[in-house]
Amino acid sequence: MNYLNKIRIENPLTICYTNDVVKNFTANGLLSIGASPAMSEAPEEAEEFYKVAQGLLINIGTLTAENEQDIIAIAQTANEAGLPIVFDPVAVGASTYRKQFCKLLLKSAKVSVIKGNASEILALIDDTATMKGTDSDANLDAVTIAKKAYATYKTAIVITGKEDVIVQDNKAIVLANGSPLLARVTGAGCLLGGVIAGFLFRETEPDIEALIEAVSVFNIAAEVAAENENCGGPGTFSPLLLDTLYHLNETTYQQRIRIQEVEKYV
């Protein structure tokens, strides 16, 4: 847990431009791992914030015509400041409007990580792909989709699901931790985007080990929380997840991490 230990010592400032539904949960989750969240949205202050921040999450869950130009502006400011961006294209396949905006953003600015479920990432590379809300199709080949997205956007790809796929540095990693309860809590996936941003430490080309650890820390904490005798369902799972992120130790991490597959390709 080299990266998590560093977070707990250095408390990296992590900026989250995220959706209205999840701001509180995201901020509390970042505090639980030791990061310092700031839910700053004003382009007017971005330049000052981004000089000292370590990572930026852009999550378009509550995208509107009023905020789309602000999102592009802060992404471009982050590029100018050398601040890595984690982009979460929430429900990108649900509407033409969302898909067009996501593609515009990805043309207007360079992101360091694109994180989403298989349907969302597929929608970024296939104009015919559709989805229902933020739900993903379990039958999609996430590794193939991640590889194609990586080739298209030349950036790290994290696909979440029953198994999680990370593609970076011409490597494909499959991780097998997590809990079904994550799908029963609004904002769990959005929090993972913030956690990944907290692990970047201003690395615009993130090391794949940082991404593996970020996803594994989050999902192992979810497993432990779900197994807690006091966990009766989604309502008790959420605070237990925060507690477990706060207390997670090296022994538990090493005992539980499941890297199911490592693939190198050109």
Curated annotation (Swiss-Prot):
State the reactions this protein catalyses.
Answer: 5-(2-hydroxyethyl)-4-methylthiazole + ATP = 4-methyl-5-(2-phosphooxyethyl)-thiazole + ADP + H(+)
Q: Which organism is it from?
A: Staphylococcus aureus (strain MSSA476)
**Per the similarity annotation, which family is this?**
Belongs to the Thz kinase family.
Pathway assigned in UniProt: Cofactor biosynthesis; thiamine diphosphate biosynthesis; 4-methyl-5-(2-phosphoethyl)-thiazole from 5-(2-hydroxyethyl)-4-methylthiazole: step 1/1
The molecular function terms of the Gene Ontology recorded here are: ATP binding; hydroxyethylthiazole kinase activity; magnesium ion binding
Membrane-spanning residues: none
Give an example GO biological process.
Answer: thiamine diphosphate biosynthetic process
User: Which keywords fit this entry according to its UniProt record?
Assistant: ATP-binding, Kinase, Magnesium, Metal-binding, Nucleotide-binding, Thiamine biosynthesis, Transferase
Stated name of the protein: Hydroxyethylthiazole kinase
Record-linked InterPro entries: Hyethyz_kinase, Ribokinase-like
